[in-house]
Amino acid sequence: MTHYDVVVLGAGPGGYVAAIRAAQLGLSTAIVEPKYWGGVCLNVGCIPSKALLRNAELVHIFTKDAKAFGISGEVTFDYGIAYDRSRKVAEGRVAGVHFLMKKNKITEIHGYGTFADANTLLVDLNDGGTESVTFDNAIIATGSSTRLVPGTSLSANVVTYEEQILSRELPKSIIIAGAGAIGMEFGYVLKNYGVDVTIVEFLPRALPNEDADVSKEIEKQFKKLGVTILTATKVESIADGGSQVTVTVTKDGVAQELKAEKVLQAIGFAPNVEGYGLDKAGVALTDRKAIGVDDYMRTNVGHIYAIGDVNGLLQLAHVAEAQGVVAAETIAGAETLTLGDHRMLPRATFCQPNVASFGLTEQQARNEGYDVVVAKFPFTANAKAHGVGDPSGFVKLVADAKHGELLGGHLVGHDVAELLPELTLAQRWDLTASELARNVHTHPTMSEALQECFHGLVGHMINF
C-alpha cells in the first residue's frame, strides 16, 4: 500500500491539471484513470470535435463561398480523412498528458478507483489485480455522462457524442435531440458533409441558455445552412427499427413522427457520482445529484475535494481546469484565487459562426434588478469580418448603468470565442466601460467590435 499527499480520481482536464499543480507545489501525487487520459475532452470531445469543425468550415467555404473566393473546379470531400485527422489530433494531445505526468513526477495508476474509506482508494487495475492507495487529500474529478431523453435508451443507431465522434462513416440523415452546444456543433459538421440534419429542442429556442438575440441569430444562420431546428418540441419516444429510427415528437399538443438513419442524444450531462464509493468516504451530494463543494472545491469531508463536471457548477473543461488549480493550491496551503460567480466564466459553441458568452443575459440582468445599459455592434460594420468573408453576427454587451461595469457579453461571429478573455478579465477586475473604451485595439481585427461596444456603453460608438 502506497501513501500520497494527494490522489486525484479521474484524469480529465480538471484532474490532470490539479495533479500537475499539486506536484508543482511539492506534494507527492498520484492520479487514477481507467480509460481516457485527458478525459472526454481530449479523447472524444472538445479536441477532436474542433478538428472536425475546422474541416467542416473548409467544406463550407468550398461549397458555399467558392465563387466569392475565386475558387472553381471539382472538389471532393472525404469525411473519413477528416475523421482520421481528428483522431491524430486527439492522440497527440493525450500523449502530451502522459508526458506532463512524467515531467512532474506524478504516479499514473491505470484502473478504476473507488473509495474504501475517507483515506483509502481501492483501484481495480486495467491489467488485472487491485491496488490500495492511501492519501492525506483526494480530488474527485470523475466527470459526467450523457443524460438520455426520459424513457429512451441507446442502441446501434441511437447514440451519444462518443459513438458519433468515433464513427468514420456518416449517416444520410440524423435527428439530434438537444440544441445545446453539442447538438449545434455536430449539426454544423454533419450538415456541411451532406447529412440531412434535424435538431429537436424542448425549450423555445436553440442554445436556450444564451441571450435571446444570440439564439435568434444562430437559428437564422443554421436555416441558411439548411438545418431544420424544431423548438418548443418534446421528444416522446425513440424507436430504432434497424435501417431507420422513428422519433415521435409533440409540439403544442400535436404529435409528429420524424424518421432518420440515426439519432444523437445531446440533451445534457449528469455528474458521475455512482460507483465510486462516495458513501464510504462520507461525501455528500446536492439535491441535483452533484457533489457539493465550497468556493475552494472542498466537499463536506474537509480533505476531499471535487472539481469539474461532477460538482455541477458549470460543466466546461476550462472551468474544471481552473477549479483544479484552486483545489491543489488550497491543499498545499498556497495563495489561491477562488472563481467567484460561475455565471461570469466564459462559455462557447464552436460552429461557424461561433457563439461565445459570459455573465448575465440582458433579460437576466433586468430580472435581477440592475439598471441596464446595452450596446450592440454588428460585424457587418467590422472591416476584418468582411476580409475574412464572414460578417455575420454581432457583439452585445450588457452593463450596469450606475457603475459602468460589465454584467455580460454575448457574441456571434467568426471565431469570436477568441475574444472572450478580454471581457472576462474586465469583469473580474471591475473595469468600467469608460476605462475599457480607452484601450487601443489593433486594426483591423474582430476585437474592434468590442471597442465599439465599450464606446457604445458610454454613449458614443464611432463606426456604427
Curated annotation (Swiss-Prot):
The active site is at H443. Triazaspirodimethoxybenzoyls are high-nanomolar inhibitors of M.tuberculosis Lpd and are non-competitive versus NADH, NAD(+), and lipoamide and >100-fold selective compared to human Lpd. It is found in: Cytoplasm. Disruption phenotype: Cells lacking this gene grow, albeit poorly, in standard medium with dextrose, glycerol, and fatty acids as carbon sources, but fail to grow on carbohydrates. They are less resistant than wild-type to exposition to mildly acidified nitrite, but are more resistant to oxidative stress in the form of H(2)O(2) in vitro. Lpd-deficient strains are severely attenuated in wild-type and immunodeficient mice. In contrast to wild-type or DlaT lacking strains, strains lacking Lpd are unable to grow on leucine or isoleucine. Its EC number is 1.8.1.4. It catalyses: N(6)-[(R)-dihydrolipoyl]-L-lysyl-[protein] + NAD(+) = N(6)-[(R)-lipoyl]-L-lysyl-[protein] + NADH + H(+). Homodimer. Identified in a complex with AhpC, AhpD and DlaT. Also is part of the PDH complex, consisting of multiple copies of AceE (E1), DlaT (E2) and Lpd (E3), and of the BCKADH complex, consisting of multiple copies of BkdA/BkdB (E1), BkdC (E2) and Lpd (E3). This is Dihydrolipoyl dehydrogenase. The active site is a redox-active disulfide bond. GO terms for molecular function: antioxidant activity; dihydrolipoyl dehydrogenase (NADH) activity; disulfide oxidoreductase activity; flavin adenine dinucleotide binding; NADH binding; oxidoreductase activity, acting on NAD(P)H, quinone or similar compound as acceptor; zymogen binding. Keywords: Antioxidant, Cytoplasm, Disulfide bond, FAD, Flavoprotein, NAD, Oxidoreductase, Redox-active center, Virulence. The keyword Flavoprotein applies. Changing F464A: Reduces lipoamide dehydrogenase activity by 95%. GO terms for biological process: 2-oxoglutarate metabolic process; cell redox homeostasis; pyruvate metabolic process. Changing H386K: Reduces lipoamide dehydrogenase activity by 91%. One of its GO terms (cellular component) is pyruvate dehydrogenase complex. FAD binds at E33, P34, K35, Y36, W37, G38, G39, V40, C41, K50, G113, D309, A317. Optimum pH is 8.0 for PDH complex activity. Half-maximal activity is observed at pH 7.0 and pH 9.0. Activity is abolished at pH < 5. It is an enzyme of class 1 (oxidoreductase).
